[in-house]
Amino acid sequence: MTPGCARAAAIVAMQSQKTREILMSAAVSFPSYAARLCGSRTASDSARQSGQNSAMRVRVVLATILAFASLAGAQPLPGTKPLDFRGDPAAAMVEGIGRYLERIRPWYAARRNPDPNELRRLIGAIDRRVEPVVMELAGAVDQPPVLVSADSFEVLAVRWPVLEGVSGEGLYLRQFSGPRHLVIYLPETDREPEQCPEIFEFAAAGADVFVPLLLSSVHPPPPAPGGWAKQQSEREWVLRMAFPLGRHPIGLEVQQVLALVDWWKQKYPDRLVEIAGAGDGAWAAAFAAVLDPRIALVETGMLGIEPPSWRDQPLYRNIFGLSRFFGEQDIRALLRFRLGTAPRAMATPMRIPLRNAEARRLRFVRQIEEFLGRLARRSRRVRDELWANIRGSSPEEWRRAAAPLERRIREEMLGELPPETAAPEPRSRPLPPAPHFRGWEVMLQVRPEFFAWGVLLVPASLPEGRIPLVVVQHGLQGRPQDLFGQKPDSRAFAVYRNFAETLVREGWAVYLPQNLYTGDFRHLVRMAHPLGLTQYSFIREQYRVALDWLQTLPFIDAQRIGFYGLSYGGKTALRVPPFEPRFRAVVCAGDFNEWVGKLVSTEEPWSYMFTEEYDMLEWNLAHVASHAELAMLIAPRPFLVERGHRDGVGIDEWVLGEFARVRRFYDEMGIGNRTGIALFNGPHRVDGEEALRFLKKWLTEP
């Protein structure tokens, strides 16, 4: 120990035994830092210094040793306050995000600028309808076309073309002597058209009446080809398939209505169209009227599109961004003087026979499935055309060209939180020492209601200079602690294989964020989607705050930060690093896939169509950016996929096919050596062998 440090040690001797042990241990554990900061002054050098300067140097040395004592795990990290949080940080994080979402709802409401074209996009009513519309009788050849007759009208089962391969079906109450006007009635979605006696009141007042079949909120969808099933209604089934394609059950029903208006105006251009609805049918009725001024009168009552909380609403009412652009009063304002009550007259309800209802529903849902399936199959070409227009011939040109599309993905697909400044107030708490590393729990404030939480690990003997940092992200229901200190017989070890310890042994720092997808969290997605936000809106902001703080630490090299994420952490790899340039190399493990197929396939058992995980849904992803395109946004930075042959998230053929598009992109840019795929013979877990070489190459080698 140099003389300067010896004087510091003398002062240490006056401290308590525990403090003395901490400080001396720190001085011994980090000799290169201590020597550099104390200097190698001789006794004669020190004698030439004034007493004041000597005292100052001793104070500096003491502060340095105290800092290194904290790096030995004995106290909070330098520059942080002690962390005294008790309880489950993941649960507290989820609860805080929920409170934040409730707080910002009025912020969005105050900034609405209702636009019918925006509503059209939000519900996905954007496809060209079939022209001309030809009304057909529907039913078996051995059954009469007329279901029931009254004195002045008859009831027919009909169908009409709507979209490519999709027909609307329902009842047509046709006046014998010609109609005065048309009423389109959309009932609650737990009823068949034949179970709506109120329709006779419209017909008794002289109207022709259409009652379209709507997707059911009580009937299950038809069985999948392989027999896989999940307990859900037709409406939820279609929502899950339509949402990533930029479509929605309500939008498809609106298209049915507008096709009826098309037919009516072909036949009776001067006669009025009126629309009425109940329950979910009222949503479609009101939205159709907003989009089509040919509808002269709207009867819906209160829609309830601004419930006290979205978390308890059915999933099939999930319209991405609706509350951001429209409230109840905004819809009513757009309808203005068209709100009213459709004419009625006293009528005796008649029983309409319910013929072939199951076959009708099967036909209707299958047609929608086929329509959405075609959109999914064509979506790659749509993305190719979109991205072909911005590809550059060099990495620098690519980054400039990709900026507008990158912004579109952030704002329209993933969602961005409203700007707000909150001091991070870093707090830390040491973990029990381990042979190879020291660690701290870290808490950083992101917004007043919620925080970022993680674990920082550093080598027990911190090398001289700044060291690389690797952020390692856990998967669904995971915790940072799953990645280190686990016994070989534990489930966490089987999945994560103490990968954080492997990285620390390389002499690197490792940060392990706690992401929100733990415990009961999915209601946050239900609350966020109407505001045009997703879980990644929060995760990305938590990452921003964490990286801002991490790069201030004196031992972290901010130019050498890497990312490794498994499973849901692999999803994070494609939704945070593409928009965060401080990550210099990225590994996506156990998730990279032909993502559109993974989301919407009704024929593969690993599809999210058959799981509870509706948090996977991202609006219109299929036509904007799937996994290959998100990986392209990482370029020109290095990108690696890690994939086990027996990983149940998909099959090699899907993963390799999607990755081929990434490899081609890197090759065409002349940086093919910066990407690859690491295949191993194993299940859904960390492998790490090739990933470690990849990170070492791009974070440590010149």
What is each stretch, according to the model?
Residues 33, 49-62:
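Bacterial N-terminal signal peptides that target proteins for export
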